[in-house]
Regions:
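Metallocofactor- and cofactor-centric catalytic cores in central/energy metabolism, strongly enriched
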Residues: 1-118, 132, 140, 144-145, ...
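Short catalytic-loop micro-motif centered on adjacent basic/acidic residues
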Residues: 18-20, 101, 122-125, 151, ...
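Glycine-rich beta-alpha junction loops
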Residues: 25, 128-130, 156-160, 177-180, ...
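Residues on a specific face of well-ordered alpha-helices
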Residues: 61, 136, 140, 160-161, ...
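Phosphate/pyrophosphate-binding betaalpha-module
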Residues: 124, 128-187
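A conserved active-site cap/scaffold subdomain adjacent to cofactor or substrate pockets
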Residues: 151, 168-232
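Internal helical hairpin/lid segments
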Residues: 210-300
């Protein structure tokens, strides 16, 4: 029986484009040297699986508006601080007097609000199915603690709608293991009926190699497929507890993705009974239209239309020290991975 490495190195089938949906997969594939094993007819492209990267410019502008115009203390993950908005980043806003507090979880933000009752505190809630439950729990805790100074600015997204929107960009999706651990595999299985093929992958060298080998073998059969190559963590049903929590507190809404535009029913928002914690409603926020830097091709990278190295400012005007786009800022960003490992 051939090993996964032998299957990959000796692949002699048709050209195939495999999209790494997850930014962690992109970094690990680079770090482990897996790209060097691929024959020329196998192309790995990056996708929209970095939550910071797909967060639109308008969201950064909204956060800056809250901080500078409303005097709100912004609690955020560190990756978001240096992402450029239309005119500045959150780091730039901090230089102008904004209160930007870095936290490691929504629970930290809720705790901060409880310890600082004289401050209005908003947590920037970004991410996919893996992080949405934690944001919900922080809102529940705020209600239980009687906090009226805590809210969340929601930009949480769901992945299946993005897969469908990008189905013509790749032949096979390398599905993120941690997302499917929450959602289960049923949604991805159902996408095969739409012609979408994919494999769920873990994050070790063995797990990634196995998933890629399975993808190449199944692709040659010529019909849509789904295989769970991460069964020790991912089940068909996923985490029912997390799903029920999110369903109790949030509902689907149309959502803007950087580079992909508005994808129907791909976002989340707080249900009516929790809307006193919705920062957009609490502060009667006006509609803000963000304008990305025209030199940045982050949107094309996220759609698999180009590689980071195809961007004219990659490694020149745009570096991790001086990023123009979100894909260079985030630790999960494709541009960051290419810059670090190329």
């Amino acid at each position: 029986m051939k090993t996964a490495r032998e299957i990959i190195e000796n692949y002699d089938g048709p050209d195939v484009r495999i999209m790494e949906v997850c930014g962690t997969h992109t970094h690990e594939i680079f770090r482990l040297g897996i790209r060097k094993l691929l024959p020329k007819q196998v192309e790995l492209i990056s996708g929209p699986g970095c939550p910071v990267c797909v967060t639109p410019v308008s969201f950064i502008d909204e956060a800056i508006y809250l901080a500078l115009e409303k005097g709100v203390t912004i609690c955020t993950f560190g990756d978001l601080v240096r992402v450029p908005g239309t005119n500045m980043s959150l780091a730039g806003a901090r230089e102008q007097g904004a209160k930007i507090h870095i936290v490691y979880s929504p629970a930290d933000a809720e705790k901060y609000a409880g310890e600082h009752p004289d401050e209005q505190v908003t947590f920037l809630s970004v991410g996919f199915e893996t992080t949405t439950p934690a944001g919900c729990l922080s809102v529940k805790a705020a209600r239980e603690d009687g906090l009226d100074n805590y809210s969340i600015l929601v930009a949480n997204k769901t992945m299946p709608q993005a897969y469908e929107a990008l189905k013509d960009s790749a032949d096979v999706f390398l599905y993120p293991g941690h997302v499917n651990a929450i959602t289960g595999t049923r949604l991805c299985e159902a996408l095969t009926e739409e012609g979408v093929s994919g494999v769920v992958a873990g994050f070790t060298a063995k797990e990634l190699m196995t998933a890629l080998a399975v993808a190449l073998v199944k692709f040659q059969e010529g019909k849509p497929f789904f295989v769970n190559c991460y069964p020790r963590v991912v089940t068909q049903d996923g985490s029912r507890e997390a799903q029920l929590l999110v369903d109790e507190m949030m509902e689907a809404c149309d959502c803007e993705w950087r580079g992909l535009g508005v994808i129907p029913k791909s976002g989340m928002k707080l249900r009516q009974e929790w809307q006193e914690f919705d920062a957009r409603l609490k502060y009667q926020m006006p509609k803000i239209e963000g304008k990305p830097n025209p030199a940045c091709r982050c949107g094309d990278v996220l759609q698999g239309k180009c590689k980071p190295s195809d961007c004219k400012v990659f490694g020149k005007g745009c570096t991790p020290q001086h990023p123009i786009g979100a894909c260079m800022v985030s630790g999960e960003g494709a541009c960051s991975a290419y810059y670090q490992y190329s």
